[in-house]
């Protein structure tokens, strides 16, 4: 009768076998082969080597010379890596670190130990930074590890400005260096950094590298270099740049700089990064094109070039069902908050505020960042690396009540903390950040004094939050109590645009749609009026803005011209230059959705975005 061993007994059986093999190695029992690397000898067992390594299995079973040799010499493999791999075979422990991971990976690759190589590869990916990505890239290329090569190349190009400051880049060969500085894909904002890098690389070994200087200078886009920087480089590197060919290259660059219209050099990736208006939403009908559906995309606009782009919508896949609000953090991370999709809600016990962030390079998708206790009509703000969910309407004991609670989320620590509450309960308010302080503006606040009237009053209050003190203070009030307005920060001043409201404190007087622009100066704690909008305009959501600031100018993307939510929205983009104090329509019939939700401003690269469909571009009509 056969008795099968299962579960814990089977595990114990395997453990016993491993322990006995370990003991045999330690006692040098039944040793039948010795590996030699860098002169160091490693007694071991052919059976163990063959079990873990197809390379050794083939060596010991295919009639090769080593079949009958007691000693096998391993060339181009370090003794340390052999020791690490044998320890893994006999002890089930892989001891890798930053110093040895490449040599261990190389040995594992040589011995065809795929599991070990995969662990080493993951370790290098997880520990990649600006100081080592270049070495990882060339290592991966050398052994043909495509995944690692692709990942390290993306990291290298994306972080090239930081990589260029490390010693590792000064050690690479001239052909490798040339390939790098030729690339259009380097994420650098100024060509001066490439010129500086070329001179540092040559100076690192003048005797051998000066001969390559002319060839290297030809790859620097000198016409993009500031003339004063170029003159300074000449003065500091007289001995290097005195070669006649170098002088010709530099003189031609000076001539080209004076007449830039005659030249059209390719910009590098980082030079194309610019501030864009992002109208992020998830209208399921979306923009329809003969070529494809843009329902899963959100509208982007470059006010400088007047070009349109799209990014993926946070509704893609099983993302957000509704986008309620958003914010762009100090480090340019794009955040949106809303409610889960219907399919996702059906599988959840509790309804939450779902918060997502966008990956903008190489992985154009939204990922879930965190969730917060469910509420509606809240505001979302940020200071440094922290998010703040402020006020809103919460369900408490089966009643929807407006709250004053404020929750802070640390992206770095991945935790929530309740901070000092608002001085009053608020919903449908807005929040902006100026000089590392939050400013909460307008909204609704409940009133209990007059039960026969509206249950809520509009607020004209401005509240300031100082995170260093965890304290709120009341600042100068607005002229109008309002909600459904848009906000933006221009030149460190807060602009509040349009909305529904009434003059002064809301005491039940008639409310109307506003074309009013109110501007707050945080330094002086005072408000002034700006130029009225061309017509009364409401934001597209009660707690989100459809305005943003780019290069010191204010832009409003669409909006409602009346209080009826069912009206067709305006598809115009308005521009206000604070110096001219006048509104201009800069685009009409733009390719935004019939209904979008949140307007944000972020620095993005058009290369990472989705171009508009050609048939809709033809239909579009811009000023």
UniProtKB/Swiss-Prot annotation:
Keywords: Kelch repeat, Repeat. It comes from Homo sapiens (Human). GO terms for cellular component: Cul3-RING ubiquitin ligase complex; cytoplasm. Coiled coil: none annotated. Gene3D superfamilies: 1.25.40.420, Kelch-type beta propeller (2.120.10.80), Potassium Channel Kv1.1, Chain A (3.30.710.10). Residues 31-98 form the BTB domain. Residues 133-235 form the BACK domain. InterPro entries: BACK (IPR011705), BTB-kelch_protein (IPR017096), BTB/POZ_dom (IPR000210), Kelch-typ_b-propeller (IPR015915), Kelch_1 (IPR006652), SKP1/BTB/POZ_sf (IPR011333). Kelch repeats lie at residues 386-436, 437-492, 494-547, 553-603. PANTHER family: KELCH PROTEIN, KELCH REPEAT AND BTB DOMAIN-CONTAINING PROTEIN 12. GO terms for molecular function: ubiquitin-like ligase-substrate adaptor activity. This is Kelch repeat and BTB domain-containing protein 12. The lineage of its organism: Eukaryota, Metazoa, Chordata, Craniata, Vertebrata. It holds the Pfam family BTB. It comes from the Eukaryota. SUPFAM superfamilies: Kelch motif, POZ domain. GO terms for biological process: proteasome-mediated ubiquitin-dependent protein catabolic process.
